[in-house]
Amino acid sequence: MMKKIAILGSTGSIGTQTVDILPSIDAEVVALTTNRRINLLEEQARALHPKMVCAMDENAAKALKIKLADTDIEVLTGMDGLIACAAESGADIVVTAVVGMVGLLPTMAAIKAGKDIALANKETLVCAGGLVMSAAKQYGVRILPVDSEHSAIFQCVQAANGNPIDKILLTASGGPFFGKKIEEMRGMTREQALAHPNWSMGAKITIDSATMMNKGLELIEAMWLYDLPPEDIEIVVHRESIVHSAVEFADGAVIAQLGLPDMRLPIQLALTWPQRVPCKVPRMSLAEVAKLTFYAPDYEAFPALNLAKHAASLKGDRGAVLNGANEAAVGLFLNGKIGFTDIAERVAYALDTIPYKKDITLDDVLAADKAAREIVLG
């Protein structure tokens, strides 16, 4: 049966790779969105013929409407447009490939409309994991992870046959600054931080990989997806990015998922699950890989990890504060306003300054995010 797919953030890194794998699966695209990359969105829209498209930026949407005037594609804008593409486009499954907190409201709207979620926007679970997972259960929808690590864990968990898992082994590449001490990283430039050794990703997530905040965010995401306390999620640095993560069971057995670092495979699996279909990605040869290495992370050199672990242990609004502060600080770094090691320092200051709230609503999440950004940008 052909699936109807909405791709939120279709012009970004995950979005374009989602478009790349569409010929391999039986799918119809019903909605596409961008922030302001309307030339690429026009190209995608003319090729895929969606029912609706959205440019978050209002001026970009006006220009896009002119570009697509000869089609019957509805052009929307703003958060209302993004939510409409998620919830009102007729999609069976929504790929949430937008970056940052902007993904939360459309994801919740899609869940409440009964759409399955192919989740690439980790911030949604980091900020409001309890609310999102509760809503998914209430509305009977599946959250299918697109992150390579969480896709790996998802696949390993299938081997549990209903038995509980003891521990998640969450692998991390270590980023471009693996092995360096914090003093060595103080003067690191934007270009150095964006030089990831294994993965091709957007700028924000690449900086998060360099600070290792990305792995901290993924720890919180795993906590909510797999209902495990943070102390049962172990971060392991694995430089080759071949073992995408692993799960340990009660008897001590460990099952891992391996593959070359290519996001198209977990994207495709999220869209075809529980079926597997051929994927046009390079096949792995263990003989050519030859060696796999594993290390404990350096928590002193990468303080973002401890900040994330502390936020995970407290839950409540701490995930929203952590994420909002980090997004703002990464933006400052990318624009040359602060240094590399200032990112974690700004996040720590926000966590220390904003009063903790344990029992939260969606409005509390949005308020915590806003407060964190204001403090960092202050």
Residue ranges and their predicted role:
Residues 1-378:
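Catalytic, metal-anchored helix/loop core of enzyme active sites in primary metabolism
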